[in-house]
Amino acid sequence: LVGSEMCIRDRKKGVVYYNDSKGTNPDAAIKGIQAMNRPTLLIGGGYDKQSGYDEWIEAFDGKVRYLVLIGQTKEKIKEAAEKHGFHDIILCEDLKEAVKVCEEKAQPGDAVLLSPACASWGQFDNYEQRGDMFKEYVRNL
């Protein structure tokens, strides 16, 4: 997850933003969570491909401080997370709002990870566009 395309640092607050928009299903997104070595605000959700989210949520394993959800799947994922005892959940209308909420909630040393476990359709043309918009929103904070 490290590289110029994947990582943006907020020098004012000491927060690192990671673009793993390619994590378009729970299995791929688990790898993004596992790569985190700091408290993480996770942006997830998107188009519903009828995936199950239990294993993805189990991968939080104390790493995820907040789950910030967008898209068609936000309520479905919220219910699954709550079933697993995870309640630090924020529902947002879109990715722009999610990035802003993460910026407000993040503490020095935290990471913000876009690893949505869902497809981008319905909000974006593809995962590349979603990732590009994420980077733009972060730069404009």
Where are these regions (language model features)?
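Nucleotide phosphate-binding/pyrophosphate-handling subdomain across enzymes
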Residues: 4-64
